[in-house]
């Protein structure tokens, strides 16, 4: 998937609906942060982005959303030996 195709709310909403994911406000906000560019990131890095953008989203919601996006194929994971899991938007 080319994340650059999903750089606005309407495209992201379509992407979520296409994967049978209810596009809640929090999921859309998280998806906008994730799919704005091709990137690799950890959950902790995403949580920092959420905080930096002053979004009212809990850590639990971030982790649950990452698991949902992974299970539906929107994200791939890269497990490293040092117990970090990186998420990939490609």
Task: Identify the residue ranges that each predicted region occupies.
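Short, Lys/Arg-enriched N-terminal segment that forms or immediately precedes the first helix
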Residues: 6-20
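Non-DNA-binding regulatory cores of transcription-related proteins
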Residues: 71-90
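A short acidic, leucine-rich amphipathic alpha-helix
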Residues: 45-51
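Basic amphipathic alpha-helical segments that dock to polyanions
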Residues: 62-72
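Pre-recognition alpha-helix immediately N-terminal to the DNA-recognition helix
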Residues: 28-33
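Short capping segments at the starts of secondary-structure elements
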Residues: 23, 36-42
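Long C-terminal interaction/binding lobes of large macromolecular proteins
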Residues: 34-35, 48
